[in-house]
């Protein structure tokens, strides 16, 4: 059966730029999936997604004009129950009637268990035109569109008004109706550079015709690559690098159909404003690409992506420079105005900034942050006064003009203003870095003072918000407590602080009775659960569970313990020792009395005497290794007692009739368990 390329295009008004690429990929994949299910393609679909500001399209190779005929087998009642006294039962008659067949037309097939009556027939394949309309409509309905709109007098809804529909199979129009539009082969090109309607000659010629006749690069990926290449070439010529992330590049790609990269500049005096402010306004407000010199300093030149190609782009460049000049003038004004007041003098205004109506204002919060940060700094051996001062100033920039205009600059502007106020560099850096880490993979604060303030900030958020009952549930975490917990854990893995003690200190900083009394224990459990999630990114679940079963309060040696358990698990004795440890723990649960010291005089059998001697020899070795942080050595020592453990369980009845002997054997197993679990609960390995 011959096949041809299928093309579908929805011509729209300007689509949301941040959603464009996702919409295009979903639309193309959904159409391809529908064709596969309809058996209009053999094997996996080979398709290309197109997405530009005014169109979503997909081009799919090797699409059949008609489905292949199919042999259909409808299975009915079992042969054993279908005939009675040589006549068909009601069940068989009903099956034949439902299948539209006569009894004599039925065949007998085996369904894997028994012989059954069946009706076999050939179903003629449907043409593409009969199936495609529903496939397209279903694909449109399944698009990830948070908000839809209506247009004109129609009742149809879509993310933006749709004005045209192309459906071509090879060079032939496939007649379908979608969103109130009848399919055709005509579309529009670039809004300004194209000369009117374009007739697509063939599904395979779409991209070339759009580029040549319509001045549209229809492929999102192709436009993005072209922009990236042009940006790099222009920056290279200026010995600069482009300051931009993937999100900005994607957004700009979604805003243009025929990209042209141009170079522009702004007055040097604006460079007196912190470069973070200038970069943010260029990227966020204007979608420009700032340039950094070889020292990472902002240059007074930038790159922009135009949607127009002209012989003389000077008017485009000048227009963009004029718009940016106004933006930068605003930033310069805010910066100068903010310098008229110190951070310290701004603190009273924080009393009017509500943090949460149940736990007070930012001013009240600062009081807590100061005490928590000073406590943590002392524990870290850092300058407690510097940490307290940084915590006092940490939120002062929230009431500045610049942060009011650009909330993303909170902390950053605090650093600059702290420097201007004569604060030490350590304090200024801590003011900025106390928000770190902001997200997974973000840098940790640099230095102990900054770490103390960052820990205080996140602990106060976690304990305070949790304590008033705003606990994360499912995918709802409006106060980002999970992110705060992960940030705390990442920092604590660098420093030897007691996590439970920090939680209690933070809880005690709130007015008595304000927070739920269970908050310390609940947040500690929450942190433990988040820690498991964090560690399972790098280690198997059973190894993480073994280490965390000990409920470690210090996290700075976690990595060493995890690596040690991973190495222990590879030992030939590991599986047997893990099983023995589990058996020991189960026996210890049956103890009637409090477990204590082993009484050598009550050791009766050679196997228990040998195990006691081995445990006695093992204890100082493991204690010394753990004290020195040599966890792998501590665990590897366990391999030496495997013969004695095996012999003990093979030859000794732990739950002896004599209560004293039984208790003594349980005491022996308890001593063994303490040594086996000194680093981790090895019983859970392999579970």
What are these regions (language model features)?
Residues 1-687:
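Amphipathic alpha-helical "coupling" segments that flank catalytic cores
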